[in-house]
């Protein structure tokens, strides 16, 4: 019997995971990366992280690079959910498992999808606005990229919930590529026609920052109900300052940790763990899905959820006000 001396000297080969990220411009993806990599390393895996720089062609090249490097699992935070199916097919043909992380890759039959309940995000956004805005109030919707599957799900949840109120959506726009700066132009345009707006639904907290800046320039900051999502530090600061009403908080630590655990298990066992029992459609296929719940964070519960939960420090959240008197 021949002994593999390379194996004896080098030790067991580590699991190799490729993580391709849309862009690190949005604050939350940095936290996703850090928790994912740390968890995978704790489990004995190595992670090759690639930044697509908000470029779909670059992300496709990164997936092909991972295939060439014989990764065991590829995890994709998609730039364009509708443009990666052929790259995923090439990975599958090479025997590599693929996970859609937070954004579903459309029509690709990825091995798993892990995200938050994006429809629920829309629901709690609408519920928060319904609680804070008088009947008949006018609302703007400044959403994320139309190429992001999650945007559609958030919109569905928002609009379906809003049907139970007298609030009126009078203006809609999408920030293509999740370019938050576009929101400033949209809101300026909308305010010209609807200066009496009562609420603005924002695709994420980054977009909300641009919206609130324009509201401030028009002496409306704090008077218009603004909601976003992600629990960014700046958004939490705005909430305690009174210029943003709510952020749909999603525990990035839980999402990234579980995604890393599933990636390692899939590499070790060659199949999906048995505790993933739900499915979601990617447009053509029903994909095994793990869906986490978001939480509406307002001034009333920000200390409990964000600070006590360890997501941001109290001195950071209350940086711009005297929190000792709160």
Kindly label every feature range from the protein language model:
Residues 1-326:
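A residue-level marker of the well-folded mature domains of exported/periplasmic proteins
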């Amino acid at each position: 019997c021949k002994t593999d001396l390379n194996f004896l000297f080098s030790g067991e080969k580590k699991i190799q995971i490729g993580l391709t990220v849309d862009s690190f411009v949005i604050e939350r993806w940095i936290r996703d990366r850090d928790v994912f990599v740390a968890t995978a390393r704790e489990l004995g895996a190595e992670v090759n992280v690639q930044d697509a720089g908000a470029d779909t062609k670059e992300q496709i090249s990164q997936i092909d690079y991972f295939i060439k490097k014989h990764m065991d699992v590829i995890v994709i935070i998609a730039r364009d959910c509708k443009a990666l199916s052929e790259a995923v097919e090439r990975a599958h043909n090479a025997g590599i498992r693929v996970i859609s992380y937070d954004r579903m890759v459309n029509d690709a039959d990825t091995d798993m999808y892990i995200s938050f309940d994006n429809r629920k995000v829309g629901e709690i956004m609408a519920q928060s606005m319904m609680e804070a805005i008088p009947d008949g109030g006018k609302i703007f919707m400044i959403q994320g990229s139309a190429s992001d599957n999650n945007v559609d799900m958030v919109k569905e949840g928002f609009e379906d919930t809003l049907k139970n109120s007298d609030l009126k959506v009078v203006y809609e726009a999408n920030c293509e590529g999740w370019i938050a700066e576009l929101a400033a132009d949209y809101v300026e345009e909308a305010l010209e026609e609807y200066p009496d707006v009562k609420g603005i639904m924002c695709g994420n907290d980054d977009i909300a920052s641009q919206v609130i800046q324009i509201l401030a320039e028009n002496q409306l900051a704090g008077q218009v109900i603004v909601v976003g999502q992600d629990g960014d530090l700046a958004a939490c600061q705005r909430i305690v300052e009174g210029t943003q009403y709510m952020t749909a908080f999603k525990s990035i630590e839980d999402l990234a940790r579980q995604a890393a655990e599933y990636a390692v298990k899939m590499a070790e066992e060659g199949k999906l763990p048995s505790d993933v029992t739900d499915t979601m459609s990617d447009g053509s296929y029903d994909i095994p899905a793990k869906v986490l719940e978001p939480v509406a964070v307002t001034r009333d519960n920000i200390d409990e959820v964000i600070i006590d939960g360890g997501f941001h420090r109290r001195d950071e959240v209350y940086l711009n006000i005297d929190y000792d008197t709160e």
